[in-house]
């Protein structure tokens, strides 16, 4: 199976490209969508609460993470960002591996990975084309 990576900055057309690819019958793994789902999981919410609740006021209300507050906080603090990524990224990679596994057993010839930070942390290495 050929793995093609979609990457680019905000507003570069990744989402539009992914929609077109999906409309052609191909499967696309959306890293951002996966991260959003992970942030809604109760285990993840509890871990984030332990990590950041004392640092960020009103971070979690009604068992939901205020992702705007979390993002504003961690993107200005590299150490906290690394801590959050160490929680989220392994879960995303697990979902990505399952996506690729499902595609391979269904004999798909091509799979697409929509990964905004493709060139960070060697994410590009698992792609045949970018």
Predicted regions and their residues:
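ATP-binding Walker
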Residues: 12
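P-loop (Walker A) phosphate-binding loop of NTP-binding proteins
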Residues: 9, 21
